[in-house]
């Protein structure tokens, strides 16, 4: 009888142990599942580039002209010369009034960030305006031809894009200047003005990048343009600012995602 009782006790202890072990294993598995599906832990929600990590809710194409990550350059021109953003509209921030409405327009998705950035700059005492926004293929052709006639083709190509190679045609890029056009208007010296310095340091807070930095001319194939800013969204803008890379340099990383 005692032997049977001892055996029964051993069996009960073993069963309890198995139940506890199973419970612990199940709890660990549940924790692992939560970790694997959380936005921070999922590799699909983070793009790692040297010097920074891009935490994202979604990725974007670097080829689609409607994508906020699209790369448009001498090496990667727009496939469709007639491309025109569907959500193009005239911006509400201060702009040059002697420009056509098209050139005073950007993509609608850019408007909230642009308005916030201009408001912050104005609060700092910087009276700035959008000097140029969207440009059609034909408008860019006019600009390029004019610069070529004035400076020669080789010089023009250092600061003006051939039609089809301009970010302005995406409706995501703009030139920013002081409202006082005598104050380094679209000139390299704008980068040393209070507004230029502030924009270079804070544009990423609003999803914009300084597209053609001074130390990256060999990469971008354009001269330093402290007035030219491009919208890419806050996550990517922050990563580019932290890493010091240009959009051209991180294109391969974005395409791997």
Language model region names:
Residues 2-132, 137-257:
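Extracytoplasmic cell-surface/polysaccharide-interacting catalytic and binding patches
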């Amino acid at each position: 009888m005692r032997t049977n009782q001892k055996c029964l006790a051993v069996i009960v202890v073993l069963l309890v142990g198995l139940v506890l072990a199973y419970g612990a294993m199940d709890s660990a598995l549940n924790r692992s599942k939560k970790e694997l599906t959380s936005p921070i832990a999922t590799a699909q929600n983070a793009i790692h580039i040297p010097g920074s990590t891009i935490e994202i809710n979604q990725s974007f194409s670097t080829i689609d002209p409607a994508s906020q990550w699209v790369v448009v350059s001498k090496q990667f021109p727009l496939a469709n010369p007639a491309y025109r953003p569907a959500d193009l509209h005239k911006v509400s921030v201060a702009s040059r009034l002697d420009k056509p409405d098209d050139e005073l327009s950007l993509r609608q998705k850019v408007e909230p960030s642009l308005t916030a950035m201009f408001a912050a700059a104005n609060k700092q005492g910087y009276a700035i305006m959008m000097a140029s926004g969207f440009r059609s293929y034909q408008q860019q052709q006019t600009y390029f031809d004019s610069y070529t006639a004035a400076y020669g083709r080789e010089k023009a190509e250092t600061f003006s894009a051939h039609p089809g190679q301009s970010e302005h045609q995406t409706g995501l890029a703009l030139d920013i200047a002081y409202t006082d056009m005598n104050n380094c208007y679209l000139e390299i010296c704008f980068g040393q003005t209070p507004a230029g310095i502030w924009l270079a340091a804070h544009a990423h807070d609003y999803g914009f990048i300084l597209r053609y930095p001074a130390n990256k001319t060999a990469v971008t194939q354009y001269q330093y343009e402290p007035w030219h800013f491009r919208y890419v969204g806050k996550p990517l803008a922050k990563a580019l600012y932290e890493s010091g890379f240009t959009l051209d340099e991180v294109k391969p990383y974005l395409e791997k995602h």
